[in-house]
Amino acid sequence: DIPIVNSILDDYYFNTRFSLNPLYWLYKLTYKKLIRKVLAHKGSAIYISDKIRDKYNDDMGLDGETIYLNSTVKRKLFAPVNTDNPSITYFGNIGMGRNHSLNDIGYALGRINPKYILEVYSGSKNPLEYGVFKDNPNVYYGGTIPYEQVQEKMQNSDVTVIVEGFLPKDIDESRYSLSTKAADVLASGVTILTYGS
């Protein structure tokens, strides 16, 4: 009887979508049953936000706490944004409509100055997610890079971007989420551009 500490960072348990596919509902039912079984064991839970904590604690009878993200990124000294050739970066998940928001930012940058490039780094292996950038001359998709390199590139950026999707399904899926890169961006002292609903 070793206690379990569950890390709950998203709303997958409660989040359902409309589907006529019986396999979706079979999966969802099996998933929920497994989660209830795991959460019935002695232990606790940690959450990424107070909203998701309250939802799970109330529904499951848990006594979990919100954890607050910290970062090991070194803070850079304040410097004005280099308007001639700014380093503009995004690090993280490009699913849930974030890719389309990043693409919007890329096109907006191109209208400001065709030389401005948004560098996007993500572990996405889904061509439907990163493929939206292929016709955008102001977005460079760099794929996966090690976390140490994320920290280094972030610290050397003029602007780092945090985005969310705008479609109702994207908003619904991320309503209890918090960008895990937010702590790094805030700690870095880099200028932050946020774009979301």
Segments from the language model and where they lie:
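Proline-centered loop/turn at the N-terminus of a beta-strand
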Residues: 3, 44, 117, 158, ...
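Nucleotide-sugar-dependent
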Residues: 97-100, 148-152, 160-186, 192-197
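Histidine-centered beta-alpha loop that forms part of the nucleotide-sugar donor binding/catalytic region
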Residues: 7-11, 68-71, 164-165
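Conserved catalytic-core segment of nucleotide-activated headgroup transferases in glycan assembly
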Residues: 71-132, 140-150
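Helix-loop-beta element that forms the nucleotide-linked donor phosphate-binding surface
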Residues: 40-41, 46-47, 52-72
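Active-site proximal beta-strand in glycosyltransferases
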Residues: 2-16
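Membrane-proximal helix-turn-helix segments that form the acceptor-binding/catalytic region
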Residues: 12, 25-45
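Short, polar loop motifs at secondary-structure junctions
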Residues: 50-53, 122-128, 197
